[in-house]
């Protein structure tokens, strides 16, 4: 059991981590073996490197750290119960972490249960995890935006090129007519 100074130190560390986090997901890890927790950590590390961490935290300390970081914890008090592990992402794509976690839950037949999460500081209930896992990744979104911007420009270029081709064909036709005369 941690002593008060150690708890204060932990809250300070978590507060600084949560202030820079794009995702804070809390889950009930009951029913997971150490090997399964290690596999989840490994999968997160493979996808996000050192930008994602999964750690077990006491609910009161977790709530303090989230409050200190500016998260709206009071409205979602019911999400903080029982044994809790927290997954947070400080760098990298938070949607990738959600996908890794969701796939892990599917592989382990619904364990662990997501209690709730903050994605870009907006709260989502644990039941929304599947929907969030279907979101496109950051890179896919950027590609979609670039494609959306590029399509009208490409269409304009093709239209202008078509007009220029028509003028060129007309000029060539006039040139050929004059050469025949």
Swiss-Prot record:
GO molecular function: large ribosomal subunit rRNA binding; structural constituent of ribosome
A single BP term in Gene Ontology: translation
Keywords of this entry: Ribonucleoprotein, Ribosomal protein, RNA-binding, rRNA-binding
Cross-referenced CDD domains: Ribosomal_L10 (cd05797)
PROSITE patterns reported in the protein's UniProt record: RIBOSOMAL_L10
One Gene Ontology CC term in the entry: large ribosomal subunit
Pfam assignment, any one: Ribosomal_L10
Entry superkingdom: Bacteria
Quaternary structure annotation from Swiss-Prot or TrEMBL: Part of the ribosomal stalk of the 50S ribosomal subunit. The N-terminus interacts with L11 and the large rRNA to form the base of the stalk. The C-terminus forms an elongated spine to which L12 dimers bind in a sequential fashion forming a multimeric L10(L12)X complex.
Job description of the protein: Forms part of the ribosomal stalk, playing a central role in the interaction of the ribosome with GTP-bound translation factors.
Recorded family membership: Belongs to the universal ribosomal protein uL10 family.
Protein name: Large ribosomal subunit protein uL10
Organism, as annotated: Fervidobacterium nodosum (strain ATCC 35602 / DSM 5306 / Rt17-B1)
């Amino acid at each position: 059991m941690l002593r008060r100074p150690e708890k204060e130190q932990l809250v300070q560390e978590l507060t600084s981590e949560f202030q820079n986090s794009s995702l804070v997901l809390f889950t009930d890890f009951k029913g997971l073996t150490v090997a399964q927790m290690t596999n989840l950590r490994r999968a997160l590390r493979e996808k996000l490197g050192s930008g994602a961490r999964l750690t077990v935290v006491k609910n009161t300390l977790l709530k303090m750290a989230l409050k200190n970081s500016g998260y709206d914890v009071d409205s979602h008090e019911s999400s903080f119960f029982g044994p809790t592990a927290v997954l947070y992402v400080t760098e990298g794509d938070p949607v990738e972490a959600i996908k890794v976690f969701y796939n892990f839950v599917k592989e382990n037949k619904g364990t662990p249960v997501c209690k709730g999460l903050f994605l870009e500081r907006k709260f989502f209930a644990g039941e929304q995890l599947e929907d969030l896992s279907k979101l496109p990744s950051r890179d896919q979104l950027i590609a979609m935006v670039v494609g959306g911007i590029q399509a009208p420009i490409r269409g304009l270029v093709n239209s202008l090129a078509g007009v220029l081709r028509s003028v060129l064909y007309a000029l060539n036709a006039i040139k050929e007519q004059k050469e025949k005369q």
